[in-house]
């Protein structure tokens, strides 16, 4: 017995319903379901908009740690920064070395 399967889309960009109760701005990080997405447009609360599910982004981090290319990174939703400390939201992996003084880091988001 086989089931009908329908191809829908590549998946790099998905439609997302903004159920956060707040407007989301273009390029905001959206933590959801254990991962992060990046808003592809302004998305008003309750509306549907596009989110990026992969790509390399420069995101904020703090100046108390270093990252090495390939390190697994997480999103600290409370502070709005990348971290190596495991959180509920896996962000991806570092695509460049981050020295301690840096306040941003490059991350490849993908799933």
What positions do the PLM features span?
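Surface-exposed, low-hydrophobicity beta-strand/loop segments enriched in small/polar/acidic residues
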Residues: 1-111
């Amino acid at each position: 017995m086989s089931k009908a399967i329908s191809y829908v889309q590549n998946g790099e960009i998905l439609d997302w319903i903004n159920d956060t109760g707040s407007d989301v701005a273009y390029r905001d990080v959206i933590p959801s379901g254990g991962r992060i997405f990046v808003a592809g447009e302004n998305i008003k609360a309750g509306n549907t908009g596009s989110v990026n599910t992969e790509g390399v982004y420069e995101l904020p981090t703090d100046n108390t740690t270093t990252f090495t290319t390939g390190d697994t990174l997480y999103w600290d939703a409370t502070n709005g920064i990348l971290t190596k400390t495991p959180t509920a939201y896996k962000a991806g992996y570092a695509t460049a070395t981050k020295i301690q003084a840096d306040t941003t880091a490059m991350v490849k988001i993908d799933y």
